[in-house]
Amino acid sequence: MALVRSLLGAKKILSRSTAAVSAAPKGFLAVYVGESQKKRYLVPLSYLNQPSFQALLSKSEDEFGFDHPMGGLTIPCHEDTFINVTSRLQ
């Protein structure tokens, strides 16, 4: 019985740590950027209205559609390109 309780406790800790990583602060969206190795970025929701950011999203839709195994919004471009585009939006 003690083993079951300790396993349940470990499961709760793991689910909390996973939720903490995947949660984005209010007003932000987590995106994964890169071609082979993905890096997580938090972008303001206001970027969704910007044509240059929408172009990146269209590229993502063309490559992955709406069902990507990573589970998050993935943008398949070089990190430098993403930083260049988003730095102009600030």
Swiss-Prot record:
Point out the coiled-coil segments of this chain. none
State the compartments where it is located. Cell membrane
Q: Which GO terms describe its biological process?
A: auxin-activated signaling pathway
Keyword line: Auxin signaling pathway, Cell membrane, Developmental protein, Growth regulation, Membrane
Primary location = membrane
Keyword Membrane present in the record's keywords: the answer is: yes
Q: What is known about its induction?
A: By auxin.
InterPro entries, per the entry: SAUR_fam
This protein's membrane topology, according to the annotation, is:
Peripheral membrane protein
Single GO cellular component annotation?
Answer: plasma membrane
Q: Which domain of life is it from?
A: Eukaryota
> What's its job?
Functions as a positive effector of cell expansion through modulation of auxin transport.
Family named by the database record = Belongs to the ARG7 family.
Protein's UniProt name: Auxin-responsive protein SAUR22
